[in-house]
Amino acid sequence: MKLAKLIPKRFFIRSKDRSTVSKSPTAFSFGSASSSSGQDCKNSGGDGGGGSVTPTSILPEVPSPYSYVEILQAFKLIDRDNDGAVSRHDLESLLSRLGPDPLTEEEINVMLKEVDCDGDGTIRLEELASRVVSLDPARDSTELKETFEFFDADRDGLISADELLRVFSTIGDERCTLDDCKRMIADVDEDGDGFVCFTEFSRMMDLQR
């Protein structure tokens, strides 16, 4: 069970600097809300219609913080009906599991437009991969902090095994148990308090890369 692969920071992180919408504290984005997202979509390879996800074996090798296998895993987490395209319904379903605050139609539109290169109203694997490749590596430390805050549900500066399990359950990983989460914490828990602080969380993410 690879934590970094299961929850890629740049796919599910909330965007605090989105200029268009920022109402919901649980509004998650696939990446930064740059107005140049259309340029990021060049050569994305989306076919604009129905069909299956492009096999990872034929996707090009490009510099990216994540492998295409990791991107595919993230894509499958969102594409709940497994039809090869992330629809508005898929996105709304994910966000409803990640937080209690309902998103407005405008917020959903912004999140789709950030990644939907061909404008067909859905997100395909190639479009998501193109978005990830274009992200700025300098944002990594900020996004790591935001990822920590997402796990830390009670905002006490520590992540418990229960909080870790909540995230796995939310995104649909039925295999992860509380004991699994306790073992993951024990691997980086330097002070032995049974919790993970931000420094220890950083080590946890490094170990999962």
From Swiss-Prot:
InterPro entries reported for this sequence: EF-hand-dom_pair, EF_Hand_1_Ca_BS, EF_hand_dom, EF_hand_pair_protein_CML-like
Bias class Low complexity marks the residues at 27-38
Report keywords, A-Z. Calcium, Metal-binding, Repeat
Listed name of the protein: Probable calcium-binding protein CML36
Repeat recorded as keyword: yes
Residue ranges of the region described as Disordered? 22-59
Repeat listed as a keyword:
yes
Q: Which residues bind Ca(2+) 2?
A: D152, D154, D156, E163
- Residues binding Ca(2+) 3 are D189, D191, D193, E200
GO MF terms listed in the record are:
calcium ion binding
PROSITE patterns xref list: EF_HAND_1, EF_HAND_2
